[in-house]
Amino acid sequence: MESVERVNLLGLDGAALSELVGQWGGKPFRARQLQRWVHQRGADSFDAMTDLARDFRAQLARDCVIEALPVNTEQRSSDGTRKWLFDVGQGNAIETVFIPEDDRGTLCISSQAGCVVNCRFCSTGHQGFNRNLRASEIIGQLWWAKRVLEAAADTARLPGGKAGEDTRVISNVVMMGMGEPLLNYDQVLPALRLMLDDNAYGLSRRRVTVSTSGVVPMMDRLSQDCPVALAVSLHAPNDALRDELVPLNRKYPLNALLAACERYLAHAPRDFITFEYCMLDGINDTDQHARELIQLARQVRCKLNLIPFNPFPASGLKRSPSARVRVFAQRLMDAGIVTTVRKTRGDDIDAACGQLAGEVRDRTRITERNATRTIPIQQVHA
């Protein structure tokens, strides 16, 4: 007799959980209770859900699990950034990064193991593509981090959000980790809905950001299904250069991308799109590039976020000097373009932008470096 795979409750959004509970004859309020236990209280045992009927808990224990990916290691940066390495099987891993700041706590999560887009400046893309993550594996990163951070005495707390907490540790979630979220849309969508659900994490749409390299048809779908803040990996002001840096541009060139951004803004929670621009020495950082970028940015309401490149050997690229970045940023601001320069965080644990999973396949380097700076997971369990 074949065993039936149990349902992982982490991956069910409110509608799917209500449907499951309804199949057992349960009322919608039972699904909401269950959702609060799983996502707000971080329960991983049905026995702990003492306000649920005993027979309902028994049904859950038979048919369901609450299970995140196994965590191999946690690393802490000197600047307070924390990174978890999750095992996705077959020798592959994904990474999740928590970035604490005075006014926010941002969790950067992954949507794929590896990435198929293969941007030239991104270490993650150079590792190749393994598989899409399931919704339970995507939201499981938030579930895990919330439990661990709330249990840590040294984690700063911020004013609460819609979900009813007096305080919260994670105030923002960005899908800027491994993978292209919009190429795993069917699994990303329920995860986003859980992030926004008042019975789960209760985050504002303005505080959840999906970053895309420009999958135009799925940008349009997201604007209808679950419009959250949008960041676009731009990195070049013209098609010829972007074709080289972001190969997806050959399928969805800049004219199509900018038109999709304009359509998205009609539904977006913010009145601008964030354009991410990785600063590469001599490649996309000249005065001419700045002039072209100004012309492009004037076509859509946007903010430019300049990102210092994090070098890795296989790229053959170098980071723009700090002075060049400052001049480039000033050119944009003088033209009236809202511009920020991203502060690098966690680069001593390879948690900075473009570095995720850069060591995942290099087991020797991982072992050597973890021996000196990794915190054993058993010390940080909630």
From Swiss-Prot:
Main location: cytoplasm
This enzyme's EC code(s): 2.1.1.192
Residue ranges of domain Radical SAM core in the record: 101-348
Keyword flag Iron: yes
Compartments (UniProt record): Cytoplasm
Catalysed conversion reaction: adenosine(2503) in 23S rRNA + 2 reduced [2Fe-2S]-[ferredoxin] + 2 S-adenosyl-L-methionine = 2-methyladenosine(2503) in 23S rRNA + 5'-deoxyadenosine + L-methionine + 2 oxidized [2Fe-2S]-[ferredoxin] + S-adenosyl-L-homocysteine; adenosine(37) in tRNA + 2 reduced [2Fe-2S]-[ferredoxin] + 2 S-adenosyl-L-methionine = 2-methyladenosine(37) in tRNA + 5'-deoxyadenosine + L-methionine + 2 oxidized [2Fe-2S]-[ferredoxin] + S-adenosyl-L-homocysteine
GO MF assignments: 4 iron, 4 sulfur cluster binding; metal ion binding; rRNA (adenine(2503)-C2-)-methyltransferase activity; rRNA binding; tRNA (adenine(37)-C2)-methyltransferase activity; tRNA binding
Binding site residues for [4Fe-4S] cluster: C115, C119, C122
Key words, A-Z: 4Fe-4S, Cytoplasm, Disulfide bond, Iron, Iron-sulfur, Metal-binding, Methyltransferase, rRNA processing, S-adenosyl-L-methionine, Transferase, tRNA processing
Protein name per UniProt: Dual-specificity RNA methyltransferase RlmN
Organism: Bordetella bronchiseptica (strain ATCC BAA-588 / NCTC 13252 / RB50)
Phylogenetic classification of the source organism: Bacteria, Pseudomonadati, Pseudomonadota, Betaproteobacteria, Burkholderiales
Gene coding for it: rlmN
